Design a protein with these regions (language model features):
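A shared catalytic/ligand-binding motif for oxyanion handling
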Residues: 1-202
Length: 202
């Protein structure tokens, strides 16, 4: 964080079963601990920004919503760990319902939105022109949320996004599987403030 001079960061798959395990000087850390296998999310904000926890989900889904003020702009930062593609609709629903609710609520209150998450979604070339996969079932659900709330998919802004692949896996048969399932979404009012999105699949 110091080398990047970051004020806000988001981490998924912390695998934390209890809060308070991690500490970072001059940051307030918000965690959604994982009650089942895998997962766990964290959102850290510089103490100088006086962050306030808006919502925390950690039972049926993982989602953290924190608000802070930068200049005159009130921004809601959202991170989380999306449901697996092969889960039933009943298991997927809590995450997407919570995500849409938090986005809609923030917009109705005049807040800007910045979302970075392990979405477990393939959005396809509709949103990410060089995506190597077609839109998946989870992608269809997220697509509805994007359209309903007029969000910008930063991964798809080719002039600002450094790469497409966010996940790379080497199989036992020597193949390399690549995907773009980690996404950054912002409210339309933040698009012009974005300088770049640097992606490292390693």
């Amino acid at each position: 964080m110091k080398s990047k001079n970051a004020s806000v960061f988001m981490v998924q798959e912390t695998n934390a079963r209890k809060n308070g395990k991690h500490q970072l000087d001059n940051f307030v850390l918000f965690e959604s601990k994982r009650t089942k296998m895998g997962g766990g999310s964290m959102l850290g904000v510089s103490k100088d920004l006086n962050p306030v926890l808006v919502s925390l989900y950690e039972n049926d889904c993982e989602l953290i919503v924190v608000e802070t003020k930068i200049g005159r702009r009130e921004i809601r930062f959202i991170t989380g760990y999306g449901p697996q593609e092969d889960w039933s609709d009943d298991l997927k629903a809590p995450f997407f319902v919570a995500l849409n609710t938090e986005i809609s609520k923030a917009l109705s209150e005049g807040k800007s939105i910045y979302i970075a998450m392990d979405a477990k979604c393939k959005l396809g070339t509709t949103y990410i022109p060089k995506d190597m996969h077609n839109m998946s079932k989870n992608g269809e659900i997220l697509s509805n949320i994007i359209e309903t709330n007029a969000l910008i998919v930063v991964n798809g802004l080719e002039q600002k996004c450094s790469s497409v692949v966010t996940r790379q896996r080497h199989t036992e048969y020597g193949r390399v599987e690549e995907s773009a399932i980690d996404v950054v979404l912002v409210s339309a009012d933040l698009e012009d403030y974005l300088v770049s999105l640097n992606i490292c699949s390693n």
